[in-house]
């Protein structure tokens, strides 16, 4: 693994290895032992979008492993005043050992990786969110003991979380169901990837059908535009019937896990009651961002 730009950058073996390393690092952290795996390493933390979990978990993780993490709001760099990305990338590659970038366009992230000459980690793009999905898979494995053979159902917008969960779940040997309203399908290349897995993947517009016998149900915010705008109002109409509620969850297996990448818009993609009933696994999932990202850094920079 040279970079983590999207889940399909990983082989099944590499995915399992990252989760194994994350388990080890989490156990050491809980025991008060954190090896300085990043001693002398410098990590650029580039953010073009607002962030809570991604920013803080990377800052804490780099610090815990003895590295230097520099947070940068890209709007405050010369790139925010028109400097070409290709120039910024070649500069950062001379100062840093690794870069994390939370941005909009996947192609920009790929250009940073191509031109900087250093490992690049996707902190979220409009296309993919691999660090979050690694945390999701870690949480499932902690609570169920395995991933292979379990059914994972995602309900929501077929954007970055759907794209990454589909690929990650299939790589992990899971059955994956994706439930999206018409017009909100996952990316075409992700559906082509999933097609190779045959009956292990199912795409539907029917929430009850998609949730049937699911072991894990995941969702994410699908209305992140400004309230009251035409797009926001249209999404509220398009996603009627796609809110995770206790009644809808009855289609899944008893005691199914419920995951949410956060932030949660209670009353939109998930009911307040269901969110609070499953808060333990949701906030374990948030904590595991720290541990899986440390694992990714350890694999890329410390040869773990």
Please provide the spans of the model-predicted regions.
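Short, structured coil segments at secondary-structure junctions
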Residues: 65, 95, 115-116, 172, ...
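Anion-binding alpha/beta catalytic cores of soluble intermediary-metabolism enzymes, centered on
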Residues: 90, 97-168, 260
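Positively charged, low-complexity intrinsically disordered leader regions
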Residues: 1-56, 60
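Glycine-rich phosphate/diphosphate-binding loop of Rossmann-like nucleotide-binding domains
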Residues: 48-60, 142-220
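Active-site cofactor/substrate anionic-group-binding motifs, chiefly glycine-
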Residues: 42-43, 47-95
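Rossmann-like adenosine-cofactor binding region
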Residues: 195-273
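Adenosine-phosphate binding glycine-rich loop
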Residues: 255-256, 261-304
